[in-house]
């Protein structure tokens, strides 16, 4: 990697670790949204705030096309106590980024920075909306953003999101035609034992 790529990667790692150390629950992602807005402003983007309380939208336009896409990441953490001992472990008792939303937020900031830095290199023609969504963890943050006018204010031809998946080898990705991980349901069980991610109880 060239020096610029090394610096870029180091900056993303630092962002992710900062976010991991400061988890916030659904609709209370105030520090996180401040950090996101500051970064997007630093990249030279228009920044819009207030959708779903703590949502942030970064706008990057280039060329004359009316085409537009959205890139989306979630920001909220979970009410869990982190037992890790590394330096960037959660500093908030009882809260933890246990589902990777710190990574999602850092990755989307990385994409925003990369496209902003290359905006004069004809990388795209149209608009890219960077959507930082609060309250993904069963709190309806996406639905709230839509109900409050996300697509009315920022019309898009398509929206793309992703989710980290540790079981996929580094450098590979899985793609599904249509919705994936788009459902939620609630139930209660009582388990005695070590905690885990509900999607991977066997691990």
Segment roles from a protein language model:
Residues 56-57, 78-80, 84-96, 102-103, ...:
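Histidine/acidic-residue-rich, glycine-tolerant segments that coordinate divalent metal ions
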Residues 2-97, 102, 106-125:
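Acidic/His- and Gly-rich active-site-bordering loop/insert found
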């Amino acid at each position: 990697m060239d020096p610029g790529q090394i610096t870029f990667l180091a900056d993303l790692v630092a962002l992710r670790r900062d976010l991991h150390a400061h988890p916030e629950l659904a609709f209370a992602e105030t520090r996180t949204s401040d950090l996101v807005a500051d970064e997007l402003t630093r990249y030279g983007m228009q920044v819009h705030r207030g959708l779903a309380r703590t949502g942030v939208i970064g706008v990057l336009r280039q060329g004359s096309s009316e085409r537009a896409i959205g890139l989306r990441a979630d920001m909220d953490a979970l009410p869990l106590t982190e037992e890790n001992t590394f330096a960037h472990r959660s500093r908030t008792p009882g809260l933890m980024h246990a589902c990777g939303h710190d990574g999602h937020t850092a990755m989307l900031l990385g994409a925003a920075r990369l496209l902003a830095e290359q905006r004069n290199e004809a990388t795209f023609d149209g608009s890219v909306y960077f959507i930082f969504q609060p309250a993904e963890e069963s709190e309806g943050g996406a639905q709230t953003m839509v109900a409050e006018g996300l697509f009315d204010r920022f019309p898009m031809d398509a929206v793309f999101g992703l989710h980290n998946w540790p079981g996929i080898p580094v450098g590979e990705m899985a793609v599904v035609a249509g919705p994936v991980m788009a459902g939620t349901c609630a139930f209660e069980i009582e388990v005695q034992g070590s905690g885990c991610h509900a999607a991977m109880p066997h691990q």
